[in-house]
């Protein structure tokens, strides 16, 4: 398997070009799944307060035998704790649950714009970074206007914006904007599992043309777009397969064919960040 390339974030932190999503990996089975992911070669694990698995992530880190400094560990602040003091306490408690001294990256999970607290939360995380509790501060599901407001009021853009992105929802405008302001795009649900995109005839045909599985084809598409995909799997074989995307490449025509699958109804659920709220 080829070595995993790295991205350098706008704050100088180096991160691998693909990470292991951990949604629904909880408890002792979740620990085993995360350990198998690390053994497969993943060096970045993406968890969240709302996933209820920060403790499992910490246990996996202690069990895996890989030095802490070689890993990039991530969690997220829930929408119900966006006031300054609440954000700080939630972060501190998450570190206690995981048994960690710091998060490599800590993200605001949703902007929840009706509440109007995401800038306050972002400032709290910047201050926590100054205390050494976080190395990099990012966000999820932010629109350009949310990113601009954060920058205007704090003087900084987030290091990453983790958004829904897959062939049926390619988010070209968001990618272009993120590139303009120096924010790395992370892709959640990169395979669009609700839509079963790996079974799309166009994807199946392209995968056969390239000589790879449909999931590897899609994840390679993400990488060549310049994003960081976060495939989630607890299956060791699937984890290894999803990681093996750096030994081949797609032509411009193949990339365009995948992007052309985008649909107006491509979002998997009614979670438009303009109005959607998650607590």
Question: What are the functions of these language-model segments?
Answer:
Residues 25-28, 47-56, 80-85, 113-116, ...:
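Acidic-and-aromatic substrate-binding clefts and catalytic sites of carbohydrate-active enzymes
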């Amino acid at each position: 398997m080829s070595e995993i390339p790295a991205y350098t974030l706008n704050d100088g932190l180096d991160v691998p070009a693909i990470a292991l999503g951990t949604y629904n990996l909880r408890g002792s089975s979740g620990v085993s799944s995360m350990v198998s992911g690390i053994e497969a070669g993943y060096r970045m694990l993406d968890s969240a307060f709302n996933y209820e698995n920060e403790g499992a992530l910490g246990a996996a880190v202690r069990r895996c035998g890989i030095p802490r400094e070689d890993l990039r560990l991530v969690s997220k602040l829930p929408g119900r704790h966006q006031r300054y003091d609440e954000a700080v306490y939630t972060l501190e408690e998450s570190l206690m649950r995981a048994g960690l001294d710091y998060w490599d990256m800590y993200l605001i999970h949703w902007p929840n714009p009706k509440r109007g607290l995401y800038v306050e939360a972002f400032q709290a995380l910047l201050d926590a970074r100054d205390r050494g509790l976080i190395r990099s501060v990012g966000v999820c599901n932010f629109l350009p206007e949310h990113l601009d407001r954060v920058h205007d009021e704090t003087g900084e853009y987030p290091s990453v914006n983790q958004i829904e992105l897959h062939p049926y929802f390619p988010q070209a405008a968001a990618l272009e904007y993120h590139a303009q302001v120096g924010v790395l795009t992370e892709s959640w649900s990169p395979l669009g599992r609700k839509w079963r995109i790996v079974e799309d005839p166009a994807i199946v045909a392209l995968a056969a043309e390239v000589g790879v599985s449909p999931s590897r084809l899609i994840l390679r598409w993400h990488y060549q777009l310049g994003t960081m995909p976060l495939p989630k799997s607890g299956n060791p074989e699937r984890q290894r397969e999803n990681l093996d995307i750096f030994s081949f490449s797609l032509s411009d025509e193949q990339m365009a064919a995948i992007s052309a699958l985008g649909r107006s109804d491509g979002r998997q659920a009614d979670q438009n960040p303009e109005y959607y709220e998650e607590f």
